[in-house]
Amino acid sequence: MRTTSNAAVKQPVLRSGHALICGSMAYDTIMVFQDQFKNHLLPDKLHMLNVSFLVPQMRREFGGCAGNIAYNLKLLGDVGHVMATVGHDFGPYAQWLERHGMPREHIRVLADEHTGQAFITTDLDNNQITAFHPGAMGHSHLNKVGDAGHVALGIVAPDGRDGMIQHAEQFAAAGIPFIFDPGQGLPMFGGEDLRRFIDAASWVTVNEYEWSLMAERTGWNEAEVASRVAALIITRGGEGSVIHTGGERLHIPTAPARAVVDPTGCGDAYRAGLIHGLLHSYDWEQTGRVASLMGSLKIESRGTQNHHFTRGEFVARYESLFGKFR
């Protein structure tokens, strides 16, 4: 579905090269509490909370936004170069990247830090309590975009605050188009910071909640943000996504999942689809549909980097839902 407006947009020109993915890499420790949190929380005692949950199930996953995006991009046949800071415990993750053919020359290891760690406890209602230790991620500003060669486009995904600011500035100064994807890092920034990110970026992508916060802090509505970038992409969960580009408003439908197993990392899979479409010059409708299908394929598997498919399987699934794949 298309609607039109009179918005002006800046159209980026991509050089030949690869995607540079600036963002976090982390270990996700996921635990399952075999009950409901609400049965163990006293509403009148929340000011003096002291609880302990027995979690018989636990697993450790490779995660972080940059790692997840790179993994999904590799499934689509592209090689994304991750720029991130990690700690002395990165060895198992490094082996995982090597096994899957994902470069790590722009991943800086800090011997005195831990790799970012998320500790997630989920109850039987899929409510989550998460504690996150940023560790080495807080030093992401030590990495410089200029150290990476042959970059066609970049993405500034959730990372250390200073790193996100500096990488956006460095992409803009180098004339490299980039996606601003603030994600869960958005609350770190005030309105003036966000306005600068938007004005520097070529594309902006957020989910519905993040958009509400961005609009509130910047004072800009959808049309005002869309007029400053080549595309504003807002994902709306089960309602699909909306892409504002070239004065048009495109509605991208969801790709029905065969099973809903784990939504964690779906946003990163979606963003890999956006990058793939941009690298291969798809139109925005096809790019959005590729991104939508990536999110659905991810939701069918537990964890953020455990799903697999071949190129042929992806194209067949796409064509069964949306018609001819370019």
What are these model-derived regions, one by one?
Residues 2-81, 92-95, 325:
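Glycine-rich phosphate/adenosyl-contacting loop at the front of the ribokinase-like
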Residues 2-16, 219-326:
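Conserved phosphate-binding/catalytic region of the ribokinase-like
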Residues 14, 147-149, 198, 226:
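A short, aliphatic-rich alpha-helical micro-motif
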Residues 25, 159, 269:
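Active-site metal-binding loops of divalent metal-dependent hydrolases
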Residues 74, 172, 279:
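Gly/Ala-rich phosphate-binding loop of Rossmann-like dinucleotide-binding domains
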Residues 83-88, 105-115, 230-236, 253:
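Beta-strand->loop->alpha-helix junctions that form or flank phosphate-binding loops
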Residues 105-110, 118-162:
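Conserved phosphate-binding/catalytic loop of the ribokinase/pfkB sugar-kinase fold
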Residues 165-252, 259:
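Conserved phosphate/ATP/ADP-binding segment of small-molecule kinases
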